[in-house]
């Protein structure tokens, strides 16, 4: 191979390889974006509470059968913001035309952030509160105030739990 041909071959090979070599060393950037919105998830261990009949002289606070309601709350919230769990009775307890105020139902609580309270049909009662995102578990043991003056009947209402994470 002549010197000219060799030189032409080397120059051609070098010119073809040079852009690839320079491109391999060029930095590039990409933007990664993840949107994390406030979100909440709530699970209860039971969908019904039952208070058995009892003699008011023997038991003036009747515990719900089945033991405490276990509550699992998951929330994503803005850092430093409160996450609040409340419960509200849809109405007072009713049996036909007879009514027993929801305030005859109370609860004790266990678990970080959980508090004892009294049921209401007008104002949501606080069950628990936390700060920021997280997973929280606790329980409520419900009690019914058992007195001689309650009219007989089977009384019902619906409990509406609300978990809010701003």
Predicted regions and their residues:
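Bacterial N-terminal signal peptides that target proteins for export
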Residues: 1-8
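N-terminal small/polar-rich segments of proteins
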Residues: 22-166
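Bacterial N-terminal signal peptides
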Residues: 8-17
């Amino acid at each position: 191979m002549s010197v000219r041909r060799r030189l032409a071959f080397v120059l051609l090979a070098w010119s073809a390889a040079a852009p690839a070599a320079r491109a391999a060393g060029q930095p590039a950037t990409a933007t990664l974006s993840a949107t994390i919105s406030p979100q909440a998830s709530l699970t209860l261990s039971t969908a019904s509470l039952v208070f058995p009949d009892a003699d008011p002289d023997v038991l003036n606070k009747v515990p719900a059968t089945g033991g405490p309601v276990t509550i699992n709350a998951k929330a994503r919230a803005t850092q430093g913001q409160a996450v609040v769990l409340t419960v509200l009775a849809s109405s007072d307890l009713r049996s036909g035309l007879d009514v027993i105020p929801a305030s005859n139902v109370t609860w004790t609580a266990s678990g970080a952030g959980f508090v004892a309270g009294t049921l209401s049909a007008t104002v949501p009662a606080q069950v628990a509160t936390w700060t920021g995102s997280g997973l929280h578990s606790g329980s409520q043991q419900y009690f019914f105030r058992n007195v001689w003056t309650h009219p007989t009947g089977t009384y019902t209402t619906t409990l509406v739990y609300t978990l809010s994470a701003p």
